[in-house]
Amino acid sequence: MADLQKIVDDLSALTVLEAAELAKLLEEKWGVSAAAAVAVAAAPGAGGGAPAAEEKTEFTVVLAAAGDKKIEVIKEVRAITGLGLKEAKDLVEGAPKPVKEGVAKDEAEKIKAQLEKAGGKVELK
């Protein structure tokens, strides 16, 4: 049997676009539609009334701008993401770009504080 942990790791590393493409390929291969399952899951309950507002649990930290201290921001991006110097520099210079995706609220706010302290402008989405 295939190494399931490797499959999980590979799927976790996919970008959103790659995950969407994978879903499309699996739908074609297996002859199913993910849209039907989503529609059933999103259907309101028979109890009526307004559904409770759900608090967002996963955030994307987006570097909106590097600001005046670009070198400091690059250093922080490297420390947060583990990217190499060139990759971190490209990310900072290409702002607005996501620095980290799918992180918990407390971690996202911590990353935001680090980047803002270094001089960057940050958004949480």
Curated annotation (Swiss-Prot):
Family recorded in the similarity comment: Belongs to the bacterial ribosomal protein bL12 family.
A GO CC annotation given for this chain: cytosolic large ribosomal subunit
CDD domains named among the record's database cross-references: Ribosomal_L7_L12
Organism classification: Bacteria, Pseudomonadati, Pseudomonadota, Alphaproteobacteria, Hyphomicrobiales
Described purpose of this protein according to its UniProt entry: Forms part of the ribosomal stalk which helps the ribosome interact with GTP-bound translation factors. Is thus essential for accurate translation.
MF GO annotations: mRNA binding; structural constituent of ribosome
Biological processes per GO annotation: translation
Name of this protein: Large ribosomal subunit protein bL12
Keyword field: Ribonucleoprotein, Ribosomal protein
Pfam families: Ribosomal_L12 (PF00542), Ribosomal_L12_N (PF16320)
Naturally occurring in which organism (per UniProt): Nitrobacter winogradskyi (strain ATCC 25391 / DSM 10237 / CIP 104748 / NCIMB 11846 / Nb-255)
Subunit structure, interactors included: Homodimer. Part of the ribosomal stalk of the 50S ribosomal subunit. Forms a multimeric L10(L12)X complex, where L10 forms an elongated spine to which 2 to 4 L12 dimers bind in a sequential fashion. Binds GTP-bound translation factors.
Domain of life: Bacteria
Disulfide topology: none
PANTHER family: 39S RIBOSOMAL PROTEIN L12, LARGE RIBOSOMAL SUBUNIT PROTEIN BL12M
